[in-house]
Structure formats: C-alpha cells, structure tokens
C-alpha cells in the first residue's frame, strides 16, 4: 500500500517529536532563567533611578539590551496530510527543505481546490513545483507570511474513473494550467490477473537498510559529498560526471527531436516537456541514495544517469496510458451515442 512506502518518514517524525519534546523542556527552564535575569535587572534599574543603586543606569541598560531569550525549539516535519496553504507556508518556514503532502485519495485534495474561498490553493501548489520559489501571503487575520523556499511534493492515489473526470476539463486550453503535467511520477499499473497468496516474512535487513539511507539523507550535509556552494546561489549543487553529462546530452537530444516534435496528443507533449528537469532530478536522487548507502561522493555518476533515463522510459508508457483515458474522448462519446 501507499502507506508502507511512508513508514521510514513516520519513524523519522517520531524521533523528531521525541527530540522536540526534550528540547521543549529545556527551553522552558532556560526561559524562566532569562525572565529571572530580566526581572533582576529591572529591579536594579529602579534602584539606580532612585539613586540607591550600586551601578549606573547606562550599564544596566546595556545588559538588558544584551540579554537574549532562548530560541524556541522547532519540530522537524517531513510530511502532512491536510493543511491550509497559510499553515503550510508556516511549516515550510520551519522546514525549508520542503514537505510531503500525502493523501490516500488525491481526488479529495483536488476537489478542495475548487471550493469557494480556496481558489488560490491551486496556484500555491503550482508555484511549489519548482522547489526553489519564494512566496508571500498577506491576510488580514494572519498578517504577512513570507516563505523563503516553497517546496512541496504531492503523493497519493486516485481511481481511473475519478482521474478521467478531472482530466476532461483539462483538455480545454483555458483550464489546462499544467497541474497534471507536474505530477511527473504518474503510474497506472495493470490489474493483477493471476492473483496468488504470498505469505512471507518481510526482509528486515533490507527494511532497516532503507531506513538508514533515508535517515542519512534527511541529515546530510551535501557540501561534504561534493556539492558546490557559491555566492548568490541559495542552494549547493552537484554536476554530472563527464560520462553522465554525455549520456544526458544524448538523452536530451532524443527527447527534443524524437518525442517533442512528433504529432502527438498535446497534453502528452506538455508532460514530456517536464522531463527536461525530471531526468536530472531522478539522477541526482539516485546518486544521493548511493552516497547515503556508502558510495563515494562527487559528481552525479553515469550509473545514476542511466537509472534515471531508464526510469523515464518506464514512466512514458504509464503517461500514455493515463492520458489515453481522455485522448479519444470525443470518439468514445460518439461510439456510445451510436
């Protein structure tokens, strides 16, 4: 099930909550101490003002200005199941690496964007796709919320019939805002025809290995593994190795000439247009997984680029199947009427 894939994140969130609770107790003690120091200085200032103090008001003022309250701990978050865009903006301020929005049934999320008063939600998620945009929200009740790094991933499932009803309006140019094309890891698997009962003990070693990889990625300092930091750049970045760059150039040339210039369904072409960034993104993810599993750092490897290219080929067949639900909708309607 979908939830099985999220168990490592759930484990990380439990550990983050335990750490947050421990830091919260220390914060409360530190806050009491800071308040006591502040009260003591206030008392001393009153005495200085009345001429009975041992120190000058200026020295006490300097100490008050230098007095710092302890930083309130922030709980690390990795995912959410339901949040308004205002609350999501606040969570992203506290978790600038981004968040995963998980819904078992995505149709509920999509439908919520059509409700009166929630019209801006859809635009918010469209803007969050790049992963490096900033966002400013101004509300009378909440005031101004500035989110430096707008980065949200969406994960969930949807039934083909409900997906079709959502895709049909997107065929209209005015309603095709590119949201569906941004769901780049769309998969539409075959139904299992020859079902068999499989009753096996899970591979605990593999499960623990997967968790360790995800935990290392969550806390990884990428600059220690070959990422470059430059002035003016908000994020460190990695290059392809020479071999991987050659493969990417060949793959991109094939995409531009063989796939994007053919007479194909327009929404499919728009979807494939997003692959220009999908392939290197998948290569980077694959490379970092290898690094977290013990491989050496450095440029994104040829092996990671090959995996990414193969994954894009795999996803292409699923994309065609998804859009095939509505590609010939006019002919299907005519056949039904006939």
Language model features by range: what are they?
Residues 1-338:
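Phosphate-handling catalytic cores of nucleic-acid transaction enzymes
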């Amino acid at each position: 099930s979908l939830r099985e894939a999220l168990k490592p994140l759930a484990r990380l969130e439990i550990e983050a909550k335990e750490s947050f609770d421990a830091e919260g107790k220390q914060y409360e003690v530190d806050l009491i101490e800071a308040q006591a120091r502040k009260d003591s200085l206030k008392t001393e200032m009153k005495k200085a003002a009345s001429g009975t103090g041992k120190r000058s008001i200026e020295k006490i003022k300097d100490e008050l200005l230098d007095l710092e309250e302890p930083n309130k701990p922030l709980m690390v978050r990795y995912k959410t199941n339901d949040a308004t865009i205002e609350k999501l903006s606040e969570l992203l301020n506290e978790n600038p690496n981004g968040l995963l929005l998980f819904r078992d049934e995505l149709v509920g999320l999509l439908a919520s964007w059509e409700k009166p008063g929630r019209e801006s939600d859809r635009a918010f998620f469209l803007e969050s796709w790049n992963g490096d945009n900033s966002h400013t929200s101004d509300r009378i009740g909440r005031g101004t919320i500035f989110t430096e790094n707008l980065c949200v991933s969406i994960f969930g499932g949807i039934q083909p019939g409900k997906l079709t009803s959502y895709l049909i309006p997107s065929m209209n140019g005015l309603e095709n805002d590119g949201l569906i094309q941004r769901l780049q890891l769309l998969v539409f698997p075959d139904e299992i025809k020859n079902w068999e009962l499989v009753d096996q003990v899970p591979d605990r070693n593999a499960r623990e290995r997967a968790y360790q990889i995800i935990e290392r990625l969550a806390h990884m300092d990428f600059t220690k593994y070959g990422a470059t930091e430059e002035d003016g750049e908000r994020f460190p970045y990695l290059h392809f190795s020479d071999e991987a760059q050659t493969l990417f150039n060949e793959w991109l040339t094939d995409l531009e000439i063989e796939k994007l210039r053919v007479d194909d369904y327009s929404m499919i072409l728009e979807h494939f247009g997003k692959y220009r960034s999908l392939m290197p993104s998948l290569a980077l993810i694959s490379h970092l997984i290898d690094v977290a599993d013990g491989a050496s750092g450095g440029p994104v490897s040829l092996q990671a680029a090959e995996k990414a290219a193969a994954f894009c080929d795999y996803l292409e067949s699923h994309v065609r199947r998804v859009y095939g639900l509505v590609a010939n909708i006019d002919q299907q309607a005519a056949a039904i009427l006939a």
